[in-house]
From Swiss-Prot:
First-level EC class: transferase
Gene transcribed to yield this protein: nadK
Known function: Involved in the regulation of the intracellular balance of NAD and NADP, and is a key enzyme in the biosynthesis of NADP. Catalyzes specifically the phosphorylation on 2'-hydroxyl of the adenosine moiety of NAD to yield NADP.
Required co-factors: a divalent metal cation
The keyword NAD appears for this protein: yes
Protein EC: 2.7.1.23
Protein name (database record): NAD kinase
Top-level taxon in the UniProt lineage: Bacteria
Length: 293
């Protein structure tokens, strides 16, 4: 019987011995079952595995059928921006804090992962955002974000000025500390802490969440996911700004630049155990009340 996943990759730079032990346990367990296992090359100095198993994320995306990300959501975000370019399924073992994107319990993952490897899983496709900085009509820099792209001051927090256009239609101008533009996946992250709404992952929508706006009438806005958001940065801003992608990659923005943010054509193929329930995850992670009866 042909396996659904024959080549499996282990991803995630561990920050603690427990995460490293999970990598080692996974490697030994999967190779013992006859799977071909690739390992994130960033683990080379921490994990005792054959050198020919080590490779970068681009090679993993090209060769593997399944990627197992060990760590927290930050590890998943970093992997997602690369692996979304490839036809590869991704699942996570939670060794972080909240773990909205990493389903498997590190202490008991073997049972659930066995069922996943046998084909008992559900698939979600999560879209990413593309963020571009335009200067004098040319793209100066760009990157992708699974959670959010955030326009904010560079080093010192202060008020900035910009205009917001949706598909070339002027929406509003704003004086604030910045603007969070989030996917449904990112609606439970930075956007949520800024007062934004929680969006079901299947929604084709983008949220715009002002950061400490100067007017009380500024409120979060949800727009169709196929819209292009354009931010025109005022030339009067006295210093350089940034667009931060998932809090991991920063794009410098100068006064007078334009920032274009739109849905990427690439999607992350995220898989979950068969019993996955998004609202159950929200209830557990956010401390919602349990059933009354």
């Amino acid at each position: 019987m042909k396996r659904i996943f024959q080549t499996i990759a282990l991803i995630g730079k561990p920050r603690n011995p427990d995460a490293l032990q999970t990598h080692k346990t996974l490697f030994d367990w999967l190779t013992g079952k006859g799977y071909d296992v690739l390992v994130d090359h960033r683990l080379a100095n921490d994990l005792d595995v054959p050198q020919d198993c080590l490779c970068d994320l681009l090679t993993i995306g090209d060769k593997a059928n399944l990627a197992i990300v060990v760590g927290g959501d930050g590890n998943m975000l970093g992997a997602a921006r690369v692996l979304s370019r490839f036809d590869i399924a991704v699942i996570g073992v939670n060794r972080g804090n909240l773990g909205f994107l990493t389903d498997l319990d590190p202490e008991s993952f073997k049972e659930e992962l066995t069922r996943v490897l046998e084909g008992e899983f559900v698939t979600e496709r999560r879209f990413l955002l593309e963020a571009e900085v335009h200067r004098h009509g040319q793209i100066k820099s760009r990157n992708a974000a699974l959670n959010e792209a955030v326009l904010h001051p560079d080093k010192i927090a202060h008020m900035i000025e910009f205009e917001v256009y949706i598909d070339d239609n002027f929406a509003f101008s704003q004086r604030s500390d910045g603007l969070i533009i989030a996917t449904p996946t990112g609606s439970t992250a930075y956007s949520l802490s800024g007062g934004g709404p929680i969006l079901s992952p299947s929604l084709n929508a983008i949220t715009l969440v002002p950061m400490f706006p100067h007017t009380l009438s500024s409120r979060p806005l949800v727009v169709d996911g196929d819209r292009c958001i354009k931010l025109l940065v005022s030339p009067n801003n006295g210093s350089t700004l940034e667009v931060s992608c998932d809090g991991q990659v920063s794009l410098p923005v100068s006064p007078g630049d334009e920032v274009h943010i739109y849905q990427s054509p690439e999607q992350l193929q995220l898989i979950h155990p068969k019993n996955y329930n998004y609202y159950g995850v929200l209830r557990a992670k956010l401390g919602w009340s349990s059933k009354l009866f």
